[in-house]
């Protein structure tokens, strides 16, 4: 018997509840950790020894995964406007990514090290007004992409959360101009009703 939309939505919510429980059980700070795990395993994103930058890191789920994958070999630098409790193996900077002084501090922490992977799960403060939220969300993604054009190593990768809507097509084209390959990912832990989707840029162009 074909599932109805309602039953599919229920199943998705049930799975999401599972990830919430699993995160608490396994010590991850957010269910978002499982989104990164799924994508990282599928696309082989992490290798020990690499330099990783996590933008919009708080509360730290993605940074936890990055630190585990690096296994003490490499560097992980995380940034967020909100406070984040320390994570072993991760350097944290608190500040607004949109401010030049904060971006300069991030670059100083990297000390000219080539960045191999940028992961970005940033979201704007939600107003509930779709047009405003979409515009702000795309702006954050654009800033992260701009950071990649300046700091990401040739051949490096970029994973970013975006929301489908106004500005998405233009941003996708900008990603394709920056990377050899761009794919979309919707991990199981992502809420089914959400318009969020992850874009993965593979192999930054010279």
From Swiss-Prot:
Transmembrane segments: none annotated. Keywords: Cytoplasm, Methyltransferase, rRNA processing, S-adenosyl-L-methionine, Transferase. Gene3D superfamilies: Vaccinia Virus protein VP39. Its main location: cytoplasm. The keyword Cytoplasm applies. The active site is at 161 (proton acceptor). GO terms for cellular component: cytoplasm. GO terms for molecular function: rRNA (uridine-2'-O-)-methyltransferase activity. Its EC number is 2.1.1.166. S-adenosyl-L-methionine binds at residues 60, 62, 80, 96, 121. It catalyses: uridine(2552) in 23S rRNA + S-adenosyl-L-methionine = 2'-O-methyluridine(2552) in 23S rRNA + S-adenosyl-L-homocysteine + H(+). Specifically methylates the uridine in position 2552 of 23S rRNA at the 2'-O position of the ribose in the fully assembled 50S ribosomal subunit. Belongs to the class I-like SAM-binding methyltransferase superfamily. RNA methyltransferase RlmE family. This is Ribosomal RNA large subunit methyltransferase E. It comes from Nitrosospira multiformis (strain ATCC 25196 / NCIMB 11849 / C 71).
